[in-house]
């Protein structure tokens, strides 16, 4: 629900606005960031996490988000605990890719994860950065 241009989460019964402390929260399978005033962060980022117009975490890349959602749908289910889902994501990454020598990232580089994850999803092979990037985005989505 939007009030005065700020997004708030309405409880499942539809009668009250849920209150959350400042910080990251998992709500209905999505990750959200709540600001000091109780509203949800939208169309912005906090440190390394980006949130869309609905306040939900996104990689910022629709293609990558689609790959991640498809992979998670293939290896997890709603009956799993968070730990089981994380293990399933790890096994998915381990079992759905092959090693391919690729150029190393420059020391101190922080922008490698997105490109590496996309490469891994698209080619089903990559170096350690590709495996790590793919797992990173899958884990964040959980």
Give residue spans per PLM region.
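Generic, ordered loop/turn and secondary-structure boundary motif
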Residues: 41, 121-122
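Aromatic side chains
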Residues: 8-9, 32-33, 90-92, 99, ...
């Amino acid at each position: 629900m939007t009030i005065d241009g700020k997004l708030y989460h309405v409880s499942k019964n539809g009668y009250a606005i849920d209150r959350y402390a400042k910080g990251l929260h998992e709500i209905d399978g999505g990750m959200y960031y709540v600001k000091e005033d109780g509203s949800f962060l939208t169309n912005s980022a906090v440190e390394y996490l980006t949130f869309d117009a609905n306040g939900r975490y996104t990689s910022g890349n629709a293609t990558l988000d689609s790959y991640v959602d498809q992979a998670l749908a293939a290896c997890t289910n709603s009956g799993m605990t968070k730990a089981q889902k994380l293990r399933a994501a790890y096994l998915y990454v381990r079992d759905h890719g092959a090693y391919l020598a690729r150029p190393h990232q420059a020391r101190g580089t922080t922008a490698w994860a997105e490109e590496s994850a996309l490469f891994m999803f698209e080619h089903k092979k990559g170096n350690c950065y590709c495996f790590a990037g793919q797992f990173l985005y899958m884990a964040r989505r959980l």
